[in-house]
Amino acid sequence: MSSHRATFFCDPPKPETHTIPNSVSLKNLLAVVLSIQIALWVLMGLNVLGISIPIVQPLIGFLYLTFVPGILVLAVLRMRNLGIVETILYAVGLSLTVVLSIGLVLTIIFDALNILTPFSLITITSSVSFLVLLLCAFTYFSNRTHPKPLFNTKISVPLTPTLFLCIIPFLAVFSTYLVNTYNVGAGQLFLWSIIGVVVLLIAFDKVIPSTLYPLAVFVIAITILFQQTLISTWLYGADIQSEWNLANAVLTAGIWNPNSSVVQYNGMLSVVVLAPIYSLISNLDLIWVFKIIYPVLFALVPVGLYQIFRKQLNVKVAFLSCFFFMSFATFYTGMITLARQEIAELFFVLLILLLVSKEMDQRIQSALFMVFGLLLVVSHYGLFFIAVLFLFLMWLVLTIARVGGSKLTLRHLQTKIGIHTDKQITAPSHWSLPRSLGVHKDKQITEPSPSPPPRSLVTILTISVLFIAATAWYFFTAQGSVSIRIVSLVSNIAGSIGDLFNPRYSEAVYVVAAGPVSGLLHRVNAFVNYLNVFFMLAGVCLIVFLKNQRFKLQVPYIVLSSITLGFLIASVALPYLGAELNWTRVFQITLIVLAPFLVIGFVKICEAAGVVTGKVTSKLGFGNSTLVSPSRLMRLLAIYLVFFLLLSNGFLFALTEGYQNMALSTQVDDVYNHETIAGAKWQASNSVTVPLSGKRVTISYFADGVRYEDTSQITDANGQIIYNQTFSSAGRREYYAAFASDGFYQNSTSAIVDVNVGTNQVSSNATGQSTANVSSAAPTITLSASTTIPEVGQPVTFTIKLTGDQVVYGDYYNTILLSSLGIGQARLPFFLQNEIANGSNIFLGTYNIEHNTILSVNFEGVNALADYQNVTSLTSNRSLIYSNAGASVYS
């Protein structure tokens, strides 16, 4: 770090600093917690009286749920010396654990007691408050005899750069206001420039000291996330619409039913429990919980990564690694559409942080590892299976290196990674990379060599418990749809194993084969992305395979990185694997581990190029080059990464090509304006039930415990099947009708109709209506009989009627919106006029009307291909039944 501090214009005197107290006493902690608790009660009481104070309750509620339970748990565990950053990270992780556990336990207890509304304001508030007060008592009794402070958090903070950083997220609020209100994106462009300036100030050792690097990481993360999430008053993206719908159903019904939907997200507590509780406690609409609170929680992921990298490399490398992670577009565009994965990645990062932490008590470390692992299970099934695969392979490699007969493997680790039995590590004189990464050349390091994680942290028992818990959870929630999907994925991969690197089944290969969009800047963008991958590959290879070089990366992390790189390659090569999560999301997940290797690869390659250049210039008589000093390389890398960010977020495209995206304009098709939302809500409230014709229904019955299929017929124009049956023998028969999914409507089964032949016993059910499937996309099927007590030989007329939600057609983005509002039959595509079902409606949003086009999506293998088509032919022979100058509905 340079000893000179500077502003943008001159070298100022030493900046004023503020020192945060180095201790938090038991008395002070309990006083703050109880004050927040009482303030929350008062605010809720005022709300009951009809007095609402804007901003205050959402802020107090957020702080209460996000920090208070976790801080108290840390105090009970006497985890005093974590430092302020790790204290915040673990406190948030433990607070989320407490909140999710409360929601799950209440659901189980209320279901057992047959009480209907565990997710009500009074129930949630009482439960959380009771647990907080209980934790306060535990904190008091476990620490009252210990004179030491609860937390040691001493840190010197320069006031001017701190205030400068803290202002930046508020600029995001202002810049998005300009876009939403005036459709002006200049504020967004300016803010991206400010972020670039912050990165360069850090790289050039100006203004911002290293103590503020974690704050800078958080500020950059939350700013670029808010630049996206605060656009529009509605949510952006596909998955998050379904997540909102499920969470809203919990709030509306006051209860979470684990099997109320076949949608896999219904088993994710990170959506169906966490969001409703935040909404209730903070008095914040569910939309804004997803748009504000979830991004704030997700912004802690890069902060956690900074701690992981800082424990192994120097602070500058840790910061630039985090900035690269945040600069990848999926971080701020794709992840904001996946609320469950935002929470899951936080738990995943906490697991890795535990792996590289050496200061923590081993028993507490193991307990936290298990807790965060279980929370990952109920947060995101895809990321959990990736994580447990990584952990299992890491355990396997490290176990082989430990046990007898593994001398060859151990020798490989010693020679390839640089671990020596004498615990003396020497960097060769020609190797200058470690200086820039926190290791000095020509210096013997006498500290013990890194060792694998404690046996109690990553063991086969821990991994087995997590896997069994996940299997049980995914089997018993969301009607087992997660388990079905995983089995289907494995089957698809196994059945197509001969199609390695086939672009039809690999999104990454398809993108590379298709090449970039025409235009110089698009080609530069593609080249930079390929270059990033090259630097990461080079970095991993340098660590693992190059002899006699030693980095401060721990052995478990190196093994984890190698496994992660292998998974990334497999997601490209294996059919269906990358597409299951979407390949850009897979790449974003792997960056959690691989981000620092871009820095390592960049620096080493530049140093090698510098050596060659130096030799050439020396022979030409120009002397030795000093252009590749460590500090200059860090600055060069910072400039490169800022350029990468400005390419990824559309800044350079906006300046040179007038390009618009959702962060810069509301006049793009993936942004829902007020008129489009109003029109969609009108359609949702005016949808009708229509008969389903041309659908096959099977009528079956049980007699003496044996199932018989009676008939299978097609519904007529009225959605009915009418048929007669004559019985030749007496006895009881239980009839029901069933409809099998046809790709548009889900399975549905009617209730039982008892038919007692040759007896005067009256059936209690002459008409059965479907109740088996409560999904909005499931049709209703009714079965009735003309009589349920016929005589032998007397004909009985059975009537089956199949009805379903009215079909509403919309383009790709509007279909997502309509589905989130509960329209179970919002469909794509508009390819041919004769595909439009009778009795259906067509919904057009603002973008469709202004451009007279609709966006449809085709699939070529696993690759989604977007196509804009003219809408005139679809609406020319239909009646306009709704219009608000920004949305239209045709019948």
Predicted regions, residues:
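Membrane-embedded, hydrophobic transmembrane alpha-helices
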Residues: 2-210, 414
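Transmembrane catalytic cores of multi-pass membrane glycosyltransferases
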Residues: 51-52, 127, 237-240, 331, ...
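Active-site lumenal/periplasmic loops and adjacent helix-entry segments of GT-C-fold
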Residues: 54-55, 61, 181-185, 201-346, ...
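Membrane-embedded helix bundles of polyisoprenyl
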Residues: 92-107, 132, 136, 140, ...
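Membrane-interface helix-loop-helix junctions at transmembrane boundaries of multi-pass membrane enzymes
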Residues: 152-157, 205-208, 362-363, 406-414, ...
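Hydrophobic, aromatic-rich transmembrane alpha-helices
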Residues: 197-202, 466-467, 525-552
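Transmembrane alpha-helical segments
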Residues: 383, 601, 633-670
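Signature aromatic-anchored transmembrane alpha helix within multi-pass, membrane-resident enzymes
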Residues: 447, 463-468, 606-652
